[in-house]
């Protein structure tokens, strides 16, 4: 390498001394004259890519005077000279370079590809650093480090963003406390539901069935078992609503409409959060564990699939009692129920719950990306379950004996909009 670099001192001489006979310049001119465009004229075009802000406008490459694109290997160069220098070092090509003109060629954007030795010597002379060119293993390690740093910065930004998100105010904490207590006092078996649940015998849900107009069938024995727990389940939803301060301020007419609209949705949510993946069951009303087919054949049909699917998806959210309670409050205060009088007031109530809910989610700092919008999508799922059940109820009422329906069940679900 020392032998090939011995002509570096000629780079400091005046330009007229670098071309002893002037032949090299004429050769370049002849090449341009024959083709009208040399291969280098393509790379001499201004690059269309990103140009760093630290470069002056049209700042030249220190090697060939083409338009520079950035700071490469400790010098401001164009993409062509950067790539040439990198390939030369990575592939150890410089020992094989030679010059026909004693290593004293002028290097510019026209001549740079015509003498590799002089181009490389000029790269060294202007200060391009060989030690900054990485071999394959070092390049892979550098890319890995860059990616690790990128991931680390993203985590730091996420943590910073979470820390900047508002948490509940003192008034919101009080509202959250009341809603949580309302849920806990009306949620059968509380956190002990797994120890106290009883599994519906497997033979129930498989007996002769009454045909339904839509092709589904109802197992009357299973339906009878479900109706035994439906009245206390509905009563607990009503009690939950009555414990919420903003609900009690509404007119009786609006209270009834809101309760009828949300009852199935809240009961479905309470069942869904008690989904057990090991036994593949939902626990209804905190006491009866049922399988998907049993609930389906017991009268709910496709609604059963929707509730089980919701239970499976909610398992990943790891909701606590407060989050379940606030979700119920949001479902209760739905201002789009048909027949409501004070829709504006109800909408403001729901907004109050939603804001406290969002701030509580910020406080909990879940690890799931976009947790809050994903959780709000479950409100839509629950509303769909309620609408499907209203349609399903009409079929059950036609096909199942009237005496099997508890009075409160009929009172809540009759006359619902489908």
Curated annotation (Swiss-Prot):
SUPFAM superfamilies, alphabetized: Glucocorticoid receptor-like (DNA-binding domain), Nuclear receptor ligand-binding domain
Domain NR LBD: 171-415
Protein known as: Thyroid hormone receptor alpha-B
PANTHER family reported for this sequence: NUCLEAR HORMONE RECEPTOR, THYROID HORMONE RECEPTOR ALPHA
GO biological processes: cell differentiation; negative regulation of transcription by RNA polymerase II; positive regulation of DNA-templated transcription; positive regulation of transcription by RNA polymerase II; retinoic acid receptor signaling pathway; thyroid hormone receptor signaling pathway
Region (Disordered): 1-40
Gene Ontology cellular component list: nucleus; RNA polymerase II transcription regulator complex
Modulating: region residues: 1-60
Main location: nucleus
Membership in a protein family: Belongs to the nuclear hormone receptor family. NR1 subfamily.
Domain notes from UniProt: Composed of three domains: a modulating N-terminal domain, a DNA-binding domain and a C-terminal ligand-binding domain.
Gene Ontology terms for molecular function: nuclear receptor activity; nuclear retinoid X receptor binding; protein heterodimerization activity; protein homodimerization activity; RNA polymerase II cis-regulatory region sequence-specific DNA binding; sequence-specific DNA binding; thyroid hormone binding; zinc ion binding
Zinc finger intervals, NR C4-type: 61-81, 99-123
Keyword Nucleus: yes
Keywords: DNA-binding, Metal-binding, Nucleus, Receptor, Transcription, Transcription regulation, Zinc, Zinc-finger
Subcellular location: Nucleus
Function: High affinity receptor for triiodothyronine (T3).
Residue spans binding DNA: 61-128
Subunit structure: Binds to thyroid hormone receptor element (TRE) weakly as homodimers and monomers, but binds TRE with much higher affinity as heterodimers with retinoid X receptors. Can bind DNA as a heterodimer with either rxra or rxrg.
InterPro entries, per database record: NHR-like_dom_sf (IPR035500), Nucl_hrmn_rcpt_lig-bd (IPR000536), Nuclear_hormone_rcpt_NR1 (IPR050234), Nuclear_hrmn_rcpt (IPR001723), ThyrH_rcpt (IPR001728), Znf_hrmn_rcpt (IPR001628), Znf_NHR/GATA (IPR013088)
UniProt KW Zinc-finger keyword: yes
